[in-house]
């Protein structure tokens, strides 16, 4: 599995601001969107383009456009919604697919309660977005759901991740690419990433 830790200075600066314990909901939300925008730039560098001829101000001109069915953005509810606008700022024509998961309190594994995928998934590149990749359970379930639709090009965009989750995904789905702003140290006993961001969903939605 290809893992890209994007160490761009702007990303690292913005992520540092997000780690502040007293960061406001407004600022945290804006920063999540900004980092998502920068991660999208990195994750789409290999998109195929094709030449088309358009009418420019001085006559016909050949330009490049993205080839094929393009992209579907897949936020994992609810925290993934906090990154969606940042991705769509970069790819405004992208279709949005949605996955909703909850945790089974007995098995502690994610269970899908909602899914809505764009048409033609077998021809699309799926960008899964979620602020945190912790145990990898939610991502694993989402990847499996996407592959059942026929989607074969899948990438994940995360603000923070830990080695345990990355290793789990790598074993199960070595074909998936991961783009992450920071690979953090570890999970604590409660399953939170350290140093992490705290509960990113609560911070994005103001329910902390």
Swiss-Prot record:
Q: Which InterPro entries match?
A: PRibTrfase_dom, PRTase-like, Upp_B, UPRTase/APRTase, Ura_phspho_trans
Show the CDD domains listed in the entry. PRTases_typeI
Say which enzyme class the record assigns: transferase
Q: Which UniProt keywords apply?
A: Allosteric enzyme, Glycosyltransferase, GTP-binding, Magnesium, Nucleotide-binding, Transferase
Q: Which Gene3D superfamilies match?
A: 3.40.50.2020
Protein residues bound to uracil: 193, 198-200
| Activity regulation field | Allosterically activated by GTP.
Q: Do the record's keywords include Metal-binding?
A: no
Task: Give its E.C. classification number.
Answer: 2.4.2.9
Q: Which reaction does it catalyse?
A: UMP + diphosphate = 5-phospho-alpha-D-ribose 1-diphosphate + uracil
What are the GO MF terms of this UniProt record? GTP binding; magnesium ion binding; uracil phosphoribosyltransferase activity
Cofactor(s) the record lists: Mg(2+)
Q: Where does 5-phospho-alpha-D-ribose 1-diphosphate bind?
A: 78, 103, 130-138, 199
Q: In which pathway does it act?
A: Pyrimidine metabolism; UMP biosynthesis via salvage pathway; UMP from uracil: step 1/1
Kindly state what the record says about how the cofactor is bound. Binds 1 Mg(2+) ion per subunit. The magnesium is bound as Mg-PRPP.
**Which BP terms from GO are recorded?**
UMP salvage; uracil salvage
User: What does the function comment of this entry state?
Assistant: Catalyzes the conversion of uracil and 5-phospho-alpha-D-ribose 1-diphosphate (PRPP) to UMP and diphosphate.
Q: Which family does it belong to?
A: Belongs to the UPRTase family.
- This protein is called Uracil phosphoribosyltransferase
Organism from which the protein derives: Pelobacter propionicus (strain DSM 2379 / NBRC 103807 / OttBd1)
């Amino acid at each position: 599995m290809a893992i890209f830790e994007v160490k761009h200075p702007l990303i690292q600066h913005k992520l540092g601001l997000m780690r502040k314990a007293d960061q406001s909901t407004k600022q945290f939300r804006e920063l999540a969107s900004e980092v998502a925008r920068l991660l999208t730039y990195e994750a789409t560098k290999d998109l195929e383009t094709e030449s088309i001829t358009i009418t420019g101000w001085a006559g016909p001109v050949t330009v490049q456009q993205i080839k094929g069915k393009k992209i579907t953005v897949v936020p994992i509810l609810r925290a993934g919604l906090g990154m969606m606008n940042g991705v769509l700022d970069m790819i405004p024509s992208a279709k949005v697919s949605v996955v909703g998961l909850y945790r089974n309190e007995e098995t502690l594994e994610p269970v899908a309660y909602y899914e809505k995928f764009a048409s033609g998934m077998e021809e699309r590149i799926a960008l899964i977005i979620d602020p945190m990749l912790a145990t990898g359970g939610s991502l694993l379930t989402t990847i499996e759901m996407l592959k059942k639709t026929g989607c074969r090009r899948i990438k994940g965009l995360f603000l923070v991740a830990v080695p345990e989750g990355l290793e789990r995904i790598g074993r199960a789905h070595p074909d998936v690419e991961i783009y992450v702003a920071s690979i953090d140290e570890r999970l604590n006993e409660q399953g939170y990433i350290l140093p992490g961001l705290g509960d990113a969903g609560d911070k994005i939605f103001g329910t902390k």
